């Protein structure tokens, strides 16, 4: 394994220059092709045609039966005229919509992409856990040319803390991005310890390295680190992202919590973003108090702020058993829950007791669990919310690093949202008569819009069925497309998908995954220079004070020296 990782690192260095050149050319090429395709006649022989489908484009609210011609990986023509091509998808009676986009997909591995594709997922990112900054470039290079769906990752706040507080710096497993947390979470400093000034600057510099390398944004699991991460540290983390104009996505500070705590956590992320003039993604806010969280987000959008929120259509969540908010003094004493009713082991399909919880935390602290937290009747209501995005929070199944064609019925230990979030969305929409345009906005366009507004060219060309856009497309039966995964069997793929097209290539046809590897990196162009600015007492005083005493430390992520008791937990 170590030999393979070393090879990947060397390979990534060799390829980086070529890929940077390729990325630079994509934007100009895309603009040229948009103007070229506007003049294409229906007599053109296309690479692929999608015939007689109900075309839905959320950005323009277009909804009509049309034929779609695809050439060189882009939508070249949308027409009522007859067209032909080298390959055909008969979409009669089917929906033709933008490929689904997920900003919160942890299972960034070959079989994870396979599960997503069966569910219509053409583009996925991990905007919560992310990847350590120093490993962003090799993370992308390891997937180049061998990945079936589009892939992206944020730079990780949590893993930066693990590197400089728990000593994970330089560990080979960090190249695996979000999956690395199954190793780093065996220690506790990443979640419990407040850094000193030197450590704090190292954490922020590591985040900057990832953004310099093209990470889609900053991912923070502050809700798992509420004791260790001060409000100042969270602000400084978002400030690093703000220097690049990129979003911070966060599992907010008090998730899981009661309605007031949940919204206070969202308010921290949002207030920081507004103060910094930066984008933000309030992740999986479908928790207690979700109506207020949504209202705040929509009101800010109406004022012009690029702030958005994610939901997923499941009443239960999933995490590792040692999550801070699941400790007995919080989950039982404070929130009034019982492990016997709420905490399920997805491998054994048994509920925990206090005794088995304590034993498992001691012996296997990063064991995945399913946690029931909300009424099931709320699942469809979240799908009616204006402007939200689908963030499935898809977690890994075992074996995590299985090949793309590994038998899905042999995968274990995962939440049904990993395989079924999009199928569940369409099924619930069908059962509750939610307009298809709304569902397609949630599943595709809304994420593309918000990420595109951060300057991410990749997303400015996706999430839409329009001439000149990249041909990431799903074709599905609106009456039969559905999820099949359950809490008992979480990795059963969805069915009812006629075709999934990635960058113009059919990757799923009639619910069969094909050996097509057309996935492209969802990534900003790497920057020549870092934008990291170390923090210090002196720089804070010079900016915000006319003569602050030298022992004041309010501007750095260290304990308040005027009130040292504030650092005791």
Regions found by a protein language model. Give the residues of each.
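Bacterial N-terminal signal peptides
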Residues: 11-22
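Active-site microenvironment of metallo-dependent hydrolases
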Residues: 24-66, 71, 80-81, 117-123, ...
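Metal-associated gating/positioning segment near the N- to mid-region
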Residues: 81-86, 90-146
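Histidine-centered catalytic micro-motifs
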Residues: 99-108, 222, 248-254
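Bacterial N-terminal signal peptides that target proteins for export
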Residues: 2-12
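Alpha-helix-loop-beta-strand connector modules within alpha/beta enzyme cores
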Residues: 146-151, 235-250, 275
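Active-site neighborhoods of metal-dependent hydrolases
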Residues: 155, 161-228, 266-274, 278-443, ...
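Acidic-and-aromatic substrate-binding clefts and catalytic sites of carbohydrate-active enzymes
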Residues: 106, 129-133, 226-230, 256-261, ...
């Amino acid at each position: 394994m170590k030999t393979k990782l070393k090879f990947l690192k060397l390979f990534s260095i060799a390829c980086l220059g070529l890929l940077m050149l390729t990325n630079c050319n994509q934007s100009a090429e895309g603009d040229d092709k948009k103007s070229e395709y506007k003049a294409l006649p229906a007599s053109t022989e296309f690479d692929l045609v999608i015939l007689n489908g109900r075309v839905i484009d959320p950005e323009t609210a277009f909804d009509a039966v049309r034929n779609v011609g695809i050439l060189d990986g882009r939508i070249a023509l949308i027409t009522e005229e007859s067209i032909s091509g080298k390959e055909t998808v008969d979409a009669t009676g089917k929906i033709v919509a933008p490929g689904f986009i997920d900003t919160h997909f942890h299972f960034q591995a070959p079989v994870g992409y396979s599960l997503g594709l069966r569910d219509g997922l053409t583009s996925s990112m991990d905007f919560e856990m992310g990847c350590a900054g120093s490993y962003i470039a090799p993370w992308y290079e390891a997937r180049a040319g061998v990945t079936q769906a589009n892939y992206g990752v944020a730079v990780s706040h949590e893993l930066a803390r693990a590197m400089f507080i728990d000593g994970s710096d330089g560990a080979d497993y960090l190249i695996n991005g979000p999956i690395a947390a199954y190793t780093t979470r065996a220690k506790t400093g990443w979640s419990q310890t407040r850094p000193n000034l030197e450590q704090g600057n190292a954490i922020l510099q590591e985040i900057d390295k990832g953004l310099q390398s093209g990470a889609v944004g900053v991912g923070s699991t502050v809700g798992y680190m509420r004791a260790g991460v001060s409000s100042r540290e969270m602000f400084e983390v978002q400030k690093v992202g703000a220097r690049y104009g990129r979003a911070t996505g966060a599992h907010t500070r008090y998730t899981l919590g009661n309605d007031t705590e949940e919204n206070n956590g969202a308010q921290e992320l949002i207030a920081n973003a507004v103060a910094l003039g930066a984008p933000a993604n309030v992740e999986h806010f479908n928790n207690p108090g979700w109506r207020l969280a949504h209202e705040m987000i929509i009101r800010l959008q109406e004022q012009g702020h690029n702030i958005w929120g994610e939901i997923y259509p499941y009443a239960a969540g999933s995490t590792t058993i040692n999550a801070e908010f699941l400790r007995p003094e919080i989950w039982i004493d404070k929130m009034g829950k019982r492990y016997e009713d709420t905490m399920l082991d997805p491998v054994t399909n048994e509920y925990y007791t206090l005794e088995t919880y304590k034993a498992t935390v001691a012996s296997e602290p990063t064991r995945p669990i399913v946690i029931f937290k909300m009424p099931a009747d709320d699942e469809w209501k979240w799908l009616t919310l204006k402007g939200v995005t689908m963030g499935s929070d898809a977690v890994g199944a075992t074996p995590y690093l299985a090949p793309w064609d590994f038998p899905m019925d042999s995968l274990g230990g995962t939440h049904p949202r990993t395989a079924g979030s999009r199928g569940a969305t369409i099924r619930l929409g069908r059962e509750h008569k939610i307009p298809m345009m709304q569902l397609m906005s949630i599943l595709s366009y809304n994420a593309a819009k918000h990420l595109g507004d951060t300057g991410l060219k990749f997303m400015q060309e996706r999430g839409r069925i329009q001439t000149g856009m990249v041909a990431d497309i799903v074709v599905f039966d609106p009456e039969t497309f559905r999820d099949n995964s359950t809490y008992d069997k979480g990795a059963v793929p969805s069915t009812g998908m006629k075709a999934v097209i990635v960058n113009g290539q059919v990757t799923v046809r009639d619910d069969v995954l094909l050996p097509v590897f057309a996935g492209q990196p969802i990534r900003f162009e790497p920057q020549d220079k870092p934008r990291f600015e170390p923090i210090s007492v002196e720089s804070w005083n010079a900016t915000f004070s006319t003569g602050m005493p030298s022992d004041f430390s309010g501007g750095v992520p260290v304990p308040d020296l005027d009130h040292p008791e504030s650092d005791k937990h």
